[in-house]
């Protein structure tokens, strides 16, 4: 196993960390309606918990309104309940087979809470990246002990690991700044 092999094994895990962070912050409310707000909503349907997307079409009607076109009319009440119980601060209303969700404007206090939450998710993701770097360095140390790579190769690998972590941490910082801007926009 070479330094390149170790890095190629760890880099996809770092990319997954970035993807998970993107998914995490997509569900944080901004002042605008987005279908990502409802990604985590689970509906009690047919005896099990199902993602909202599996019981209806989720769409954006306008900047402040989402809609869920429920496929099975008997599920409308369950969809309403699931959205209300998801602790998103949303109040859905049924209209035939459609559930409308109006997105209330965020208060200044709530905006600050969401910014803080975004930063917390970002910091958790950065810690995860550093853990991946630690794993990579541990792997390089092991290879050096087994005489599979030289000390120079190990040091070069550590520098590459640091560069990778720096690149992805910078990406996370940019994503936090973008999300903060979206949240604070009135």
Curated annotation (Swiss-Prot):
Keywords: Cytoplasm, Protein biosynthesis
A GO cellular-component term linked to this record: cytosol
Keyword Cell membrane tagged: no
Any one GO molecular function term: ribosomal large subunit binding
BP GO terms, sorted: cytoplasmic translational termination
Protein's cellular compartments: Cytoplasm
Keyword match Amino-acid biosynthesis: no
One Pfam family this sequence matches: RRF
Database matches in NCBIfam families: frr
Family, similarity comment: Belongs to the RRF family.
Function: Responsible for the release of ribosomes from messenger RNA at the termination of protein biosynthesis. May increase the efficiency of translation by recycling ribosomes from one round of translation to another.
Protein's name according to its UniProt entry: Ribosome-recycling factor
Species per Swiss-Prot/TrEMBL record: Chlorobaculum parvum (strain DSM 263 / NCIMB 8327) (Chlorobium vibrioforme subsp. thiosulfatophilum)
């Amino acid at each position: 196993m070479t330094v390149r092999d170790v890095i190629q094994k760890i880099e996809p895990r770092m990319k997954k960390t970035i993807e998970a962070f993107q998914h995490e912050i997509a569900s944080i409310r901004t002042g605008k309606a987005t279908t990502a707000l409802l990604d985590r909503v689970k509906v009690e349907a047919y005896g099990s918990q199902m993602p909202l997307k599996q019981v209806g079409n989720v769409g954006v009607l306008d900047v402040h309104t989402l809609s869920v076109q429920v496929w099975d009319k008997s599920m409308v009440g369950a969809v309403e309940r699931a959205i209300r119980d998801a602790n998103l601060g949303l109040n859905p209303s049924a209209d035939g087979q459609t559930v409308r969700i109006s997105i209330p404007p965020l208060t200044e206090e709530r905006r600050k809470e969401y910014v803080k939450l975004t930063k917390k998710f970002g910091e958790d993701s950065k810690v995860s990246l550093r853990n991946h770097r630690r794993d990579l360095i541990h792997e390089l140390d092991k290879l050096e002990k087994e005489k599979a790579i030289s000390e120079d190769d190990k040091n070069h690998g550590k520098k590459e690991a640091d560069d990778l972590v720096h690149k992805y941490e910078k990406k996370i910082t940019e994503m936090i700044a973008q999300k903060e801007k979206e949240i604070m926009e009135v």
